[in-house]
């Protein structure tokens, strides 16, 4: 091997260290919040119990984002390094690649892995199904915990009014309830944000696949318009009276959402099984337009549903604050 080739190989390897450094810096942002994860339930372990399932559902939902960013960072480093011939150029390329990696990396990874159109369309649908199933599980477990905390909060107030617990004891328990509810809020927001990011991935895939066939990108309903329409239908966040009526209302809502989320997850699992059966028979669509319609009909609702669950959690916290203030134990 010539000396020039040795130096070229060293330079290339030096460039390739950069994307991995960037991904290592990105990883903490995808991890659960340490302060929340260190929470040790002293009074309500039964309400904390679903959190393990909640965390797993969230991890399943976000795992593909980091992989896509990694692919983008690697390709960006190569392009940047080749274009400029130095480490700085590779670093800039890796950074840009990481930001766009979830979009470009996803599409190109699919096309590299699946040359057959039907197999690739099935793969897109499989990803959508996995995202929808995990999102439904996140909502199901979140609403289970929310219901538990609401029930315990109501019991706490009753005991305090009867003089069975001191103000200090009640506040300690109330603090744990709010910590758990805050954790639920963070999980729901993180999961919803990932689905919104995936929306960009899928739309990019639809457009790219259409371009390869010299066809216009399929028209897909706007996610933002769907979210705006849902927001207009939400109940008022204002809490009237002592908050007890609102607590009953949101608890009922949470139960409805929990049941529906479980049904949605089961529905997706059946769809996944049907897709596997179709794949074994070498059936399925090769049309990106068909896949985009499937996406529009089902996936967008998953984003809105998580946003609705966020709203229920926020309204529950607001009602708790009002009820606690009326009882004389408010701390926030």
Placement of each model-derived feature along the sequence:
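Short, low-complexity, glycine-enriched hydrophobic/amphipathic alpha-helices that associate
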Residues: 54-115
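C-terminal motif of bacterial Sec signal peptides marking the signal peptidase cleavage site
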Residues: 25-29
């Amino acid at each position: 091997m010539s000396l020039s080739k040795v130096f070229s190989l060293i330079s290339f390897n030096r460039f390739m260290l950069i994307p991995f450094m960037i991904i290592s810096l990105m990883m903490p942002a995808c991890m659960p919040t340490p302060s929340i994860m260190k929470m040790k339930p002293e009074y309500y372990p039964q309400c904390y119990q679903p959190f393990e399932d909640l965390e797993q559902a969230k991890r399943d939902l976000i795992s593909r984002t980091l992989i896509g960013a990694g692919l983008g960072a690697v390709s960006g480093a190569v392009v940047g390094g080749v274009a400029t011939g130095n480490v700085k150029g590779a670093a800039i390329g890796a950074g840009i690649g990481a930001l766009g990696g979830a979009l470009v990396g996803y599409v190109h990874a699919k096309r590299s892995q699946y040359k057959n159109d039907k197999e690739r369309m099935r793969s897109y649908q499989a990803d959508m199904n996995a995202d929808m199933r995990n999102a439904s599980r996140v909502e199901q477990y979140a609403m289970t915990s929310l219901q538990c905390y609401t029930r315990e909060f109501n019991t706490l107030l009753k005991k305090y009014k009867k003089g069975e617990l001191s103000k200090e004891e009640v506040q300690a328990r109330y603090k744990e309830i709010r910590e758990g509810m805050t954790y639920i809020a963070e999980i729901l927001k993180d999961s919803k944000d990932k689905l919104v990011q995936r929306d960009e991935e899928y739309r990019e895939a639809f457009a790219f696949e259409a371009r390869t066939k010299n066809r216009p990108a399929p028209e897909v309903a706007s996610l933002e318009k769907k979210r705006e329409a849902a927001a207009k239908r939400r109940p008022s966040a204002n809490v009237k009276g002592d908050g007890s009526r609102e607590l009953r209302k949101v608890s009922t809502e949470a139960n409805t959402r929990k049941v529906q989320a479980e049904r949605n997850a089961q529905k997706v699992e059946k769809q996944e099984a049907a897709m596997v059966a179709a794949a074994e028979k070498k059936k399925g669509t090769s049309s990106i337009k068909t896949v985009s319609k499937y996406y529009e009909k089902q996936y967008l609702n998953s984003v809105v549903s998580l946003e609705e669950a966020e709203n229920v959690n926020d309204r529950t916290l607001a009602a708790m604050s009002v009820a606690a203030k009326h009882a004389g134990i408010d701390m926030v």
